[in-house]
From Swiss-Prot:
Function: Cell wall formation. Catalyzes the transfer of a GlcNAc subunit on undecaprenyl-pyrophosphoryl-MurNAc-pentapeptide (lipid intermediate I) to form undecaprenyl-pyrophosphoryl-MurNAc-(pentapeptide)GlcNAc (lipid intermediate II).
Record-level GO cellular component terms: plasma membrane
Keywords: Cell cycle, Cell division, Cell inner membrane, Cell membrane, Cell shape, Cell wall biogenesis/degradation, Glycosyltransferase, Membrane, Peptidoglycan synthesis, Transferase
Lineage of source species: Bacteria, Pseudomonadati, Pseudomonadota, Betaproteobacteria, Burkholderiales
Listed name of the protein: UDP-N-acetylglucosamine--N-acetylmuramyl-(pentapeptide) pyrophosphoryl-undecaprenol N-acetylglucosamine transferase
Length: 357
């Protein structure tokens, strides 16, 4: 008897691809054959094949924000992508199709529905993306990382790394700590400039004895400018291009200052770390603010818009934080973790395939 087959559709950003890979790994451990529908010229082309997963090519990208000329081409591009997707599905004949977001998922999802192949959709963000808003109407099951995102949605969480979920409870990690607060700053690859400039300036406003210990990750491209910013501010910091062991970095931190992508927010909850979210202001539909509110509305994190993140505000805010308060916030964040999200999403895919057989 041949192994059941799933076709995962996700592309464009790591926020769609990485959770899809987590589900793929669970299903492969259960004996499934996993294929991936994506654009080989985009991020999925770099991330998926090294994991031993065959990338089934489909070249399609969104036109939102690309101007009138791109919008006029959309019907032709979509028709061509749908024809490609139909042929791919006819060749593969998957038992179930899982859409994790990104424009490439739209033609594949529509064609799966037309072929009566079970379609499962998972939305990572607290505001659904364009493709998933449409595909949710066609899907057998609709899943989400946060509550109340889509009609018929089941909030199963976002798949996160096991090493984050395995960290000790915040009370155990914070116990016995003394001295300066430990702050981890993660700028990310998008829009890191605001954090990279504001944090050094804010720390310079604090008395030297009141400054926290800082580890600041900014990406290789931004590292020289970040080091210069701290030097000009007269502030010592551990500046890094990358952090190889993010779980350990989070475990050591009293406070994380970061953006609010869906996976970041889910990882904060999984790790149980106090976080100040500064949402990327140009994210589509301002979805990062909605993501951050999942924790900030529960007093399990703080949210500060970038427009009002000044060095003066941040210096005053940091000066008011205590380790005891940060531990309490970290503990509340941990209560919102859904550590078995990948397994639960895989369960739903298996259920959808069985019901169709």
């Amino acid at each position: 008897m041949s192994a059941p087959t799933i076709l995962i559709m996700a592309g464009g950003t790591g926020g769609h691809i990485m959770p899809g890979l987590a589900v793929a790994e669970v299903l492969r451990e259960r004996g499934w054959r996993v294929l991936w529908l994506g654009n080989p010229d985009k991020m999925e082309g770099r991330l998926v094949p090294p994991r031993g997963i065959e990338l089934v090519p489909l070249r399609f990208q969104g036109v939102r924000g690309r101007g009138a000329a791109a919008l006029l081409k959309l019907p032709f591009l979509l028709a061509r992508a749908c024809a490609q997707a139909w042929r791919r599905l006819a060749d593969i004949r998957p038992d179930v199709v899982l859409g994790m977001g990104g424009y490439v998922a739209f033609p594949g999802g529509v064609m799966a529905a037309l072929r009566r192949t079970p379609l499962v959709v998972h939305e990572q963000n607290a505001v659904a993306g364009t493709a998933n808003r449409w595909l949710a109407r066609l899907a057998r099951r609709v899943l989400s990382g946060f509550p109340g995102v889509l009609p018929r949605g089941e909030a199963l969480g976002n798949p996160v790394r096991a090493d984050l979920c395995a960290l000790p409870e915040p009370a155990e990690r914070y116990a016995g700590r003394s001295g300066a607060l430990r702050v981890l700053v993660v700028g990310g690859s998008l829009g890191a400039h605001a954090l990279n400039t504001t944090v050094p300036q804010a720390l310079a406003l604090l008395p030297e004895q009141a400054r926290p210990q800082v580890v600041h990750q900014a990406g290789e491209q931004h590292l020289p400018a970040l080091q210069q910013a701290y030097a000009q501010a007269g502030v010592q910091a551990d500046c890094r291009a990358f952090i190889d062991d993010m779980a350990d970095a989070m475990a050591q931190a009293d406070l994380l200052i970061c953006r609010a992508g869906a996976m970041t927010v889910s990882e904060v909850a999984a790790a149980g770390v106090a976080a100040l979210f500064v949402p990327f202001p140009h994210a589509i539909d301002d979805h990062q603010t909605a993501n951050a509110r999942f924790l900030s509305d529960a007093q399990a994190a703080w949210l500060q818009p970038q427009a009002s993140l000044t060095p003066q505000w941040l210096a005053q805010w940091l000066g008011q934080r205590t380790r005891q308060e940060l531990q309490a916030v970290a503990g509340r964040a941990r209560t919102h973790a859904l550590p078995r999200a990948a397994a639960h999403i895989a369960d739903v895919c298996e259920q959808a395939a069985r019901r169709a057989s």
